From Swiss-Prot:
Pfam families: ATP-synt
One Gene Ontology term of the molecular function aspect: ATP binding
Keywords from the named record: ATP synthesis, Cell membrane, CF(1), Hydrogen ion transport, Ion transport, Membrane, Transport
Origin: domain of life: Bacteria
UniProt GO BP: proton motive force-driven plasma membrane ATP synthesis
Gene: atpG
Protein's organism: Pelotomaculum thermopropionicum (strain DSM 13744 / JCM 10971 / SI)
Gene Ontology CC entries for this record: plasma membrane; proton-transporting ATP synthase complex
Subunit structure: F-type ATPases have 2 components, CF(1) - the catalytic core - and CF(0) - the membrane proton channel. CF(1) has five subunits: alpha(3), beta(3), gamma(1), delta(1), epsilon(1). CF(0) has three main subunits: a, b and c.
Biological role stated in the UniProt entry: Produces ATP from ADP in the presence of a proton gradient across the membrane. The gamma chain is believed to be important in regulating ATPase activity and the flow of protons through the CF(0) complex.
Membrane topology (UniProt): Peripheral membrane protein
Name listed for the protein in its UniProt record: ATP synthase gamma chain
Family: Belongs to the ATPase gamma chain family.
């Protein structure tokens, strides 16, 4: 059985750790609220952009465009978005696991564009071909980052170096749930208009084909930007939940160790009393 000194030392150490997890939970909660507001406010724009792209694609009458070109998937690229840091439960490992599962099913030549240190370090250690990496993006997601990533993959796709490009990230569902998803970025697949929306005729200037040419790169940029926002909100939510669980587990450990310490102290006192009584009896 541990001594009283050891038990006190362990309790003190756990209390110190608990203070850290409490502070990290509070910080993550504040960052999560900000990231959640950003992702929720961006979703309507993303949805409307897809809708507009679908209308323009229909109006353009099947015009050919490099970003719409479908080729045999001999070279496939994956953009994998994770966090730079850990201490967020299974957030990073779930995204990486989903990406590796998808890649195992591919017989094509693979290339990776990693966003976040966790994905970069994981795939680098395992010898994957990392064509581009982005780390240290900070807490505030900038549209320029998404534009830079989009420009890289669009250039590679247009040059025929990639035949298909996928985006893998963790979709923010709610504070407790983050769902890893895989989205095909290229070739771009404009959604089809349904119902009454198909019957509406639009006038495009200078032409639907010209609008489509301008819209497609922005569609790719926005999809990546939305993925970055979703991932950031999910990261902070997962970290807040992980730190909350760690704080609760620390409280449980402190309670158990305190009980053990009280029992040890009681046993020590009982032993001392027995020794005193025994000594007194010996003197009689």
């Amino acid at each position: 059985m541990p001594s009283l000194r050891d038990l006190r030392r362990r309790i003190k150490s756990i209390k110190s750790t608990q203070q850290i997890t409490k502070a990290m939970k509070a910080v993550s909660a504040a960052k999560m609220r900000k990231a959640q507001e950003a992702v929720l406010s961006a979703r309507p724009y993303s949805k409307r952009l897809k809708s507009v792209l679908g209308r323009v694609a229909v109006a353009s009458g099947g015009v050919s465009h490099p970003l719409l070109a479908v080729r045999e998937p001999k070279k496939v690229a994956y953009i994998v978005i994770t966090a730079d840091r850990g201490l967020c439960g299974g957030f990073n490992s779930n995204v990486i696991r989903r990406a590796t599962q998808e890649m195992r099913e591919q017989s094509a030549e693979l290339s990776l564009i990693t966003v976040g240190r966790k994905s970069r370090d994981f795939f680098r250690r395992r010898g994957y071909n990392i064509a581009q990496q982005y780390v240290g993006l900070g807490e505030e997601i900038k549209y320029g980052t998404a534009k830079e990533i989009a420009s890289f993959v669009i250039e590679k796709y247009s040059a025929g170096e990639y035949d298909v490009v996928y985006l893998v990230y963790s979709q923010f569902v709610n504070i407790l749930v983050q769902k890893p998803v895989v989205v095909k970025l290229l070739p771009a697949e404009p959604p089809e208009e349904e119902g009454e929306a198909r019957k509406v005729e639009y006038i495009f200037e200078p032409s639907a084909a010209a609008v489509l040419t301008e819209l497609l790169p922005k569609y790719i940029e926005n999809a990546i930007y939305q993925g970055l926002l979703e991932s950031k909100a999910g990261e902070h939510s997962a970290r807040m939940t992980a730190m909350d669980n760690a704080t609760k587990n620390a409280s449980d450990m402190i309670d158990r160790l305190t009980l053990s310490m009280n029992r040890a102290r009681q046993a020590q006192i009982t032993k001392e009393i027995s020794e005193i009584v025994g000594g007194a009896a010996a003197l009689e």
